[in-house]
């Protein structure tokens, strides 16, 4: 898949930032101007910076590395999970549990517990427990899956993180920085770009914008996997359709969300 185009960015409303009163002054270099109290992001920079982020992710996977996709806000959950799964990468879409990376050995114990319970339900060995306990264990495995299902096959730390809305995912950003894990992030006008290694200036609230970036970064993973004979590429089951034209007023409204 080629890099994202200016046409795609415009059609999905990537240029709409947050209300001017909610901005982070550090984002000034990435802002084109303002319209009706909304900051407008400089998409020429978005195109250029996305290319760098895309190439970085592709190179990480080509080198045998793994990527964790992070997007816990409502607008991001579905597309982030779907695209990460499509290309065999990790994801966190429900909530970021403190220590998910910095205390991974403890988190891994919870993952092992989840896998054990799942096996017991699958092979029927769970039936040896009283019905009340079976119900409780069913709830436990469901909760564990909600929080950890996207990293259940993660046996070591990822080599890169792709984050939607680093302001919301502050703990994830802190953990990645502490561990030296490079961060690629869609950074809106209310975010701090200084804590991100590969900044992609753009709307992190509009569903269509999030879908575009999640799918494009997933394609970068596939490109990298195709270059690495030790990484089995995942087939692209659903060809991504070209983005449909977007009404500016409608997309601008989406930017005032979380």
From Swiss-Prot:
PANTHER family: 30S RIBOSOMAL PROTEIN S2 PROKARYOTIC AND ORGANELLAR, SMALL RIBOSOMAL SUBUNIT PROTEIN US2M. Pfam families: Ribosomal_S2 (PF00318). Residues 229-242 have a biased composition (Basic and acidic residues). One of its GO terms (molecular function) is structural constituent of ribosome. Keywords: Ribonucleoprotein, Ribosomal protein. It comes from Solidesulfovibrio magneticus (strain ATCC 700980 / DSM 13731 / RS-1). InterPro entries: Ribosomal_uS2, Ribosomal_uS2_bac/mit/plastid, Ribosomal_uS2_CS, Ribosomal_uS2_flav_dom_sf. Belongs to the universal ribosomal protein uS2 family. Residues 245-258 have a biased composition (Acidic residues). GO terms for cellular component: cytosolic small ribosomal subunit. Residues 226-258 are annotated as: Disordered. GO terms for biological process: translation. This is Small ribosomal subunit protein uS2.
């Amino acid at each position: 898949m080629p890099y994202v185009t200016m046409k795609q960015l415009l059609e999905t409303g990537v240029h709409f930032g947050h209300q001017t009163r909610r901005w982070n002054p550090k984002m000034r270099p990435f802002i084109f101007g303002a319209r009706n109290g909304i900051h407008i992001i400089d998409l020429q920079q978005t195109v250029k910076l996305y290319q760098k982020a895309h190439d970085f992710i592709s190179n990480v996977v080509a080198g045998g590395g793994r990527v964790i996709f992070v997007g816990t806000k409502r607008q991001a959950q579905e597309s982030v999970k779907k695209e990460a799964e499509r290309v065999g990468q990790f994801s966190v879409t429900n909530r970021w549990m403190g220590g998910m990376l910095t205390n991974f050995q403890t988190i891994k114990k919870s993952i092992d517990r989840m896998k054990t319970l799942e096996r017991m339900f699958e092979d029927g060995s769970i039936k040896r427990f009283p019905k009340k306990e079976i119900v409780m264990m069913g709830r436990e495995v469901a909760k564990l899956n909600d929080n950890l299902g996207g990293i259940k096959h993660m046996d070591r730390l990822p080599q890169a993180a792709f984050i939607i809305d680093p302001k919301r995912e502050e703990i994830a950003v802190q953990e990645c920085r502490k561990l030296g894990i490079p961060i690629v992030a869609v950074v809106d006008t209310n975010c701090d770009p200084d804590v991100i290694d590969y900044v992609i200036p753009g709307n992190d609230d509009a569903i269509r914008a999030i879908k575009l970036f999640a799918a494009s970064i997933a394609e970068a993973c596939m490109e990298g996997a195709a270059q690495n004979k030790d990484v089995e590429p995942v087939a692209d089951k659903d060809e991504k359709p070209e983005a449909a034209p977007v009404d500016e007023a409608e997309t601008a409204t989406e930017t005032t969300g979380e």
